[in-house]
């Protein structure tokens, strides 16, 4: 359900704007998207896991807030990111 340290490092490397950039909205949204994808796959086999479903909803809400922030601040970066991640919006 969680992502490995190697996968997280790869996501940071792919979406970061600089060498030590781990907190930009793009990086945070990419990591959240990976976690959401993993949890969605988890629910294919564990449909009644309501405790994890609550966590999933929290992650989706957090990602939505970050996406709204990015859209409000710089829409070009927002459009590029949702296209790159394959998020429908």
UniProtKB/Swiss-Prot annotation:
GO terms for biological process: translation. InterPro entries: Ribosomal_uS15, Ribosomal_uS15_bac-type, uS15_NS1_RNA-bd_sf. GO terms for cellular component: cytosolic small ribosomal subunit. It holds the Pfam family Ribosomal_S15. SMART domains: Ribosomal_S15. GO terms for molecular function: rRNA binding; structural constituent of ribosome. Keywords: Ribonucleoprotein, Ribosomal protein, RNA-binding, rRNA-binding. SUPFAM superfamilies: S15/NS1 RNA-binding domain. The keyword RNA-binding applies. It comes from the Bacteria. HAMAP family: Ribosomal_uS15_B. Part of the 30S ribosomal subunit. Forms a bridge to the 50S subunit in the 70S ribosome, contacting the 23S rRNA. One of the primary rRNA binding proteins, it binds directly to 16S rRNA where it helps nucleate assembly of the platform of the 30S subunit by binding and bridging several RNA helices of the 16S rRNA. Belongs to the universal ribosomal protein uS15 family. This is Small ribosomal subunit protein uS15.
């Amino acid at each position: 359900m969680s992502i490995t340290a190697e996968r997280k490092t790869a996501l940071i490397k792919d979406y970061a704007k600089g060498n030590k950039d781990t907190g930009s909205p793009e990086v945070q949204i990419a990591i959240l998207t990976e976690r959401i994808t993993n949890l969605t796959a988890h629910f294919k086999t564990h449909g009644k896991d309501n405790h994890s479903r609550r966590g999933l909803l929290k992650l989706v809400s957090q990602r939505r807030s970050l996406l709204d922030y990015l859209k409000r601040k710089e829409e070009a970066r927002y459009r590029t990111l949702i296209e790159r991640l394959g998020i429908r919006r």
